[in-house]
């Protein structure tokens, strides 16, 4: 079975024309494919609890046993914290990590390996190889995009899709606001998304006599398809033109993660709205305007709908490695910062945001924001720094003679990044990986795959209670062997 999506990894060797490989998901039949809302509930102090909004939880105890239960979903992501009775001092931990990773790095399956392992408690690098040198990251790039969005926009940020009325008429304009997660009828691919049906219902209340024509304003984004992307990605289901209003990120079949993507997603959304209203599709607003003159619009919108909060959309982006959603979220950051919502503007916004918060991307090349471009170059250290901030412990500060827990604003903002990472052998792009290995249910990481590039970056809780972050990027490697080598290395870290 070919189980892939996005620009990242799969257990298949299928590639597009330029070798972009799609990522694995949990299940491939209709809506049951989704593992929703996986969250870390409580500090990791010998016990890791991962609760799922779908009613499933994985509990990992000190004996590394995985127990499946069905507690309520946890609504907050707590930082991993090392066990107080950890048996390893800093020197012993570094020695063990170095021994494991030196042996792992000797595996030729890694190809040209760039890697780093750090202690999340201290941020100290425990092992590294080419860790400051840049490499092609594939979809591990999404860690940087997600981090920039959480830092700049905040986890509650939403995107609005609005409709205006052409003055003096019953004709309306659908204005794309940058949300690719809309569904047709509320039963789409993405969790808690707004729908065209909901929008139509609101419009009908304001214009009960009926709408004449529906026009599309798709002007927010001026670039939709990166010059390094392959058009074969539409048919293969891992990319679509990045337009300002889209249903299911362009999936023609929203029940199928791997569905072929539409070449005209914004026009599809406008057509769906026209049909829902029993109106005529008027086409592009730009084309409808005569002699370059704008059509007059009423100042107040007829209706609007809002996307799920950013924290939900980041989880979807990371869990399924959705490239369209990644590019759209990066453009939200660009708009927030007053930059053009283009590929270059979005990449600049990601870079500038991270630098302002203490995560400079020196030497990096950001060509797009999804990792799909083969021109991207980042280092394991770039990934490690944000992962360490997200996964680091709460610090203590003396206030009035008492130790009060506190954390940096960056750590607070980045906490949801932890929850967005797929769980080994459980969810998202790691659902079919680590099966039968000691890292199953223990490792949480973002994957990445392009031709001759494979990445795995995230964190692992060791047997001794340590929380380690890691970033492994292989270039010039065969995909499946490189992936297997990374899984083996991460599992070995879990056994420390």
Predicted regions and their residues:
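Beta-lactamase-like hydrolase cores
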Residues: 68-134, 199-210
């Amino acid at each position: 079975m070919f189980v892939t999506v996005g620009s990242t990894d799969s257990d298949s060797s299928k590639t597009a024309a330029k070798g972009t490989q799609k990522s694995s998901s949990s299940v491939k039949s209709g809506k049951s494919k989704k593992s929703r809302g996986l969250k870390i509930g409580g500090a990791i102090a010998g016990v890791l609890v991962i609760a799922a909004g779908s009613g499933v939880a994985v509990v990992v105890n000190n004996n590394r046993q995985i127990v499946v239960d069905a507690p309520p979903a946890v609504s907050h992501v707590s930082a991993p914290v090392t066990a107080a009775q950890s048996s390893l001092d800093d020197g012993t931990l570094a020695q063990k990590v170095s021994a494991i990773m030196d042996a792992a790095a000797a595996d030729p399956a890694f190809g040209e390996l760039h890697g780093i392992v750090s202690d999340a408690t201290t941020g100290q690098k425990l092992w590294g190889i080419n860790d400051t040198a840049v490499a092609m990251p594939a979809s591990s790039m999404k860690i940087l995009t997600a981090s920039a969005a959480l830092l700049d926009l905040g986890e509650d940020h939403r995107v609005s899709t609005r409709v205006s009325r052409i003055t003096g008429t019953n004709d309306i304009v659908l204005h794309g606001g940058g949300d690719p997660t809309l569904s047709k009828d509320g039963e789409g691919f993405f969790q808690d998304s707004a729908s065209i049906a909901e929008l139509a219902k609101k419009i009908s209340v304001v214009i009960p006599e009926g709408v004449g024509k529906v026009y599309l304003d798709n002007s927010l984004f001026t670039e939709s398809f990166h010059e390094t992307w392959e058009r074969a990605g539409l048919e293969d289901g891992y990319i679509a033109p990045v337009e300002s209003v889209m249903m299911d990120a362009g999936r023609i079949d929203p029940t199928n993660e791997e569905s072929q993507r539409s070449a005209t997603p914004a026009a599809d959304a406008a057509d769906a709205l026209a049909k829902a209203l029993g109106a005529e599709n008027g086409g592009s607003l730009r084309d409808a305007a005569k002699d370059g003159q704008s059509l007059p619009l009423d100042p107040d919108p007829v209706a609007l709908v809002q996307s799920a909060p950013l924290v939900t959309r980041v989880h979807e982006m990371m869990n399924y490695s959705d490239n369209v959603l990644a590019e759209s979220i990066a453009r939200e950051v660009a708009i927030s910062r007053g930059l053009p919502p283009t590929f270059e503007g979005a990449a600049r916004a990601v870079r500038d945001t991270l630098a302002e918060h203490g995560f400079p991307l020196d030497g990096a090349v950001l060509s797009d924001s999804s990792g799909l471009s083969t021109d991207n170059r980042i280092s394991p250290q770039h990934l490690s720094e944000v992962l360490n901030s997200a996964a680091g412990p709460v610090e203590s500060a003396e206030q009035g003679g008492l130790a009060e827990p506190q954390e940096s604003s960056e750590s607070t903002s980045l906490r949801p990044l932890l929850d967005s990472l797929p769980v080994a052998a459980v969810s998202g792009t790691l659902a079919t990986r680590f099966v039968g290995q000691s890292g199953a249910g223990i490792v949480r990481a973002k994957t990445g795959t392009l031709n001759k590039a494979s990445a795995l970056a995230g964190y692992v809780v060791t047997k001794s209670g340590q929380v380690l972050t890691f970033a492994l990027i292989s270039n010039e490697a065969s995909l499946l062997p490189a992936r297997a080598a990374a899984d083996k290395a991460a599992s070995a870290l879990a056994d420390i």
